[in-house]
């Protein structure tokens, strides 16, 4: 697996919401959806390599999927993993840029 494949297998998507926008402004933190097997070291390496920034800290949270029903059938959404990435002061990522 090449390094680009490794990066894109670790980082799935940026999470953009009011809360994440506030975190970006206040504490220079960015939120990404990552693979369930990704470690903090994997996330740090992927962000530093992809966006060419210096990462100060990474916190990872496992999010449990919600129970949902559809036409009287019980089901659930999948579990996923979220990474909070704090950058060194003075650096930023444009997560809204188009590829």
Swiss-Prot record:
Membrane-spanning intervals of the chain: none
Pfam families tied to this protein: Ribosomal_L23
GO cellular component: ribonucleoprotein complex; ribosome
GO molecular-function terms, A-Z: rRNA binding; structural constituent of ribosome
Gene Ontology BP term (one): translation
InterPro entries: Nucleotide-bd_a/b_plait_sf, Ribosomal_uL23-like, Ribosomal_uL23/eL15/eS24_sf
Cystine residue pairs: none
Domain of life: Bacteria
Gene3D superfamilies to which the protein is assigned, alphabetical: 3.30.70.330
The entry's keywords: Ribonucleoprotein, Ribosomal protein, RNA-binding, rRNA-binding
Protein family membership: Belongs to the universal ribosomal protein uL23 family.
Alphabetical list of PANTHER family matching this protein: 60S RIBOSOMAL PROTEIN L23A (PTHR11620)
Quaternary state and interactors: Part of the 50S ribosomal subunit. Contacts protein L29, and trigger factor when it is bound to the ribosome.
Annotated function: One of the early assembly proteins it binds 23S rRNA. One of the proteins that surrounds the polypeptide exit tunnel on the outside of the ribosome. Forms the main docking site for trigger factor binding to the ribosome.
Protein name: Large ribosomal subunit protein uL23
Source species: Xanthomonas campestris pv. campestris (strain B100)
């Amino acid at each position: 697996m090449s390094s680009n494949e490794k990066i894109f297998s670790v980082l799935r998507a940026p999470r953009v919401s009011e809360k994440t926008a506030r975190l970006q402004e206040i504490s220079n933190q960015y939120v990404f959806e990552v693979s369930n097997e990704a470690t903090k070291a994997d996330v740090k390496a992927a962000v530093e390599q992809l966006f060419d920034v210096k990462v100060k800290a990474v916190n990872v949270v496992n999010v449990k999927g919600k129970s949902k029903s559809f036409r009287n059938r019980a089901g659930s959404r999948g579990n996923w993993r979220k990474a909070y990435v704090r950058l060194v002061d003075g650096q930023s990522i444009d997560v809204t840029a188009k590829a």
